[in-house]
Amino acid sequence: MLNVRYKSVLISVLLLAITTEVWSMGLFDSLKVCLFSEVNGVVTNKGKPVAGVEVIQTAQINNGKLYTYTTMTDEQGRFHFDALFSHSINKVVPVQPRVPQNILFRYQGREYRGWKTSKHNYDEGGEINSLTARETSKDLKPIVLKCDLSDESRIKEQEFGSNIIGICEFQ
């Protein structure tokens, strides 16, 4: 009985050591995926900046884990989200990526859809940049949005990626 416990403990220690070594060698970085690129934006109402708007960003990896982040607009109506990264075995599996993305605004008891799309790649900047720019990381642009609460939600067709629905316009 003691021999079985000893083997179990030894195997556990070895697995922990191997996992730690693999992690420190950066092998898991090959599974790194960008779920939502960096976003800078400003919220206005009839062209005037709006402070105190709750901004909610969500992304979901292939119908799996839902990531949700919240911020508030500043006095100039500005908001910012860093790029959102995760790790997924799907990066090396031959399956079409699908990352639903949303940005929602809450202000004075109302909700406004700012951005709704599905990202079909795991590249940073993959929502709005060409494949050439993403592969070379040259001229990679963050997402820069102007979102007016008085605008109607519209469909925006893109040259790269899926259409985007919402009140936000690219800058």
Describe the residue ranges of each PLM region:
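A short, Gly/Thr-enriched small/hydrophobic beta-strand-prone motif that recurs across taxa
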Residues: 31-44
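Cleavable N-terminal signal peptides
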Residues: 11-12, 22
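Short, ordered, surface-exposed loop/turn motifs in non-cytosolic proteins
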Residues: 48-59
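Surface-exposed loop/edge segments in extracytoplasmic proteins
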Residues: 63-70, 110-115
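Feature of secretome-associated and extracellular-like proteins
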Residues: 2, 22-33, 91-171
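Glycine-centered loop-to-beta-strand initiation motif
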Residues: 67-87
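Bacterial N-terminal signal peptides that target proteins for export
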Residues: 1-9
